[in-house]
């Protein structure tokens, strides 16, 4: 359970981790909204801006904002490592008793942070999710796909996964340390955080339109996120492949019985079309099964390599440069079989 931490001088009560990639257009609005909220807390805080290898003026603007905002800490990654890896970099280096993860586009309102912090303190919660009140602003396609995605998450990680909760959440120091101890290389925090089982609550909010710039989560990346969610938390696709193979075997067995019965009764069994259809069907099933197996093998391959999820080019907190993330511990049983 979360421990109460006061706001005495020199104590960082809250860290706000913000992954960003090419967010020069959204940064001014973010700073203008976030700083007054945090200054009004009356407690020590830091803002950990993780520049995920941006190619625009994001780094330049962050340096300029930092001149007048000493609580702003900038971590620059050497290359674009992806949103979840950038979030990992921020969580690894945040020092606050509580840590809030926030996107840079202001769609998740920073004004809800005090409410999340108050809820965690009052009820002794380790996790507070920001949950969308509704999705009326989304297109019909987005609502349909999002609904399916969250139903999938709840099947994989259980009912503890709140519907319509993204990466806007508050974590206690205990929850952050538990996440840092996990060996997972390819992380999906929407599943990892509920899986930990810490006491949690929710703060509902209306999601706003993007303040500026373009989304960094187009359809392709959303599909990849869904695939990582499935293969990272469940062996269900492999079981599905087994059932597909069994179903195809039953169909082929039925066709075989039908063919031999026809020959036994002296009937000519026309079958070039049906035979070709069966061959194509079986081939398609095999390719799907091989593809599913390949996804899992690729995850094992990545885990065995144990490469850092990100490389830090610089960190304004200590002037660090060229620092990889600490390799995640890989259990021996994952890399080789016991004799």
Regions found by a protein language model. Give the residues of each.
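Conserved amphipathic alpha-helical interaction elements at protein-protein interfaces in regulatory
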Residues: 36, 40, 64, 68, ...
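Hydrophobic helical membrane-anchoring modules
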Residues: 2-10, 188-339
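Acceptor/aglycone-binding surface of glycosyltransferases and processive sugar-polymer synthases
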Residues: 75-79, 83-93, 98, 107-192, ...
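A generic fold-level signal
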Residues: 9-11, 42, 94, 163, ...
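Short conserved micro-motifs on helix faces and helix-strand junctions that flank
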Residues: 19, 77-79, 169, 242, ...
């Amino acid at each position: 359970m979360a421990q109460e931490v006061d706001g005495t001088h020199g104590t960082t009560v809250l860290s706000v981790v913000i992954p960003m990639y090419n967010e020069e257009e959204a940064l001014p609005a973010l700073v203008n909204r976030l700083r007054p909220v945090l200054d009004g807390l009356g407690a020590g805080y830091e803002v950990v801006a993780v520049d995920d290898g941006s190619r625009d003026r994001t780094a330049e603007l962050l340096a300029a904002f930092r001149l007048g905002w000493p609580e702003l800490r900038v971590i620059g990654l050497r290359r674009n490592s992806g949103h979840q890896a950038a979030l990992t970099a921020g969580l690894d280096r945040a020092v606050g008793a509580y840590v809030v993860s926030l996107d840079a586009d202001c769609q998740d309102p920073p004004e809800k942070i005090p409410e999340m912090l108050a809820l965690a303190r009052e009820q002794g919660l380790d996790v507070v999710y920001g949950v969308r009140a509704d999705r009326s602003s989304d297109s019909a396609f987005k609502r349909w796909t999002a609904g399916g995605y969250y139903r999938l998450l709840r099947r994989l990680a259980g009912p503890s996964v709140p519907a319509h909760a993204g990466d806007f959440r508050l974590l206690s120091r205990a929850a952050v340390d538990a996440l840092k101890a996990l060996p997972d290389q390819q992380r999906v925090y929407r599943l990892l955080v509920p899986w930990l089982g810490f006491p949690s609550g929710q703060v509902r909010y209306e999601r706003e339109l993007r303040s500026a710039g373009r989304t960094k989560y187009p359809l392709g990346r959303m599909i990849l996120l869904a695939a990582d969610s499935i293969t990272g938390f469940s062996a269900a696709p492999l079981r599905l492949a087994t059932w597909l193979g069994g179903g195809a075997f039953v169909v082929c067995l039925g066709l075989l019985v039908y063919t031999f019965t026809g020959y036994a009764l002296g009937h000519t069994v026309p079958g070039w079309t049906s035979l070709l259809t069966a061959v194509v069907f079986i081939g398609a099933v095999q390719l799907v099964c091989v593809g599913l197996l390949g996804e899992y093998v690729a995850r094992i391959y990545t885990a065995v390599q144990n490469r850092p999820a990100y490389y830090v080019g610089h960190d304004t907190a200590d002037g660090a440069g060229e620092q990889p993330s600490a390799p995640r511990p890989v259990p021996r049983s994952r890399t080789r079989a016991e004799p």
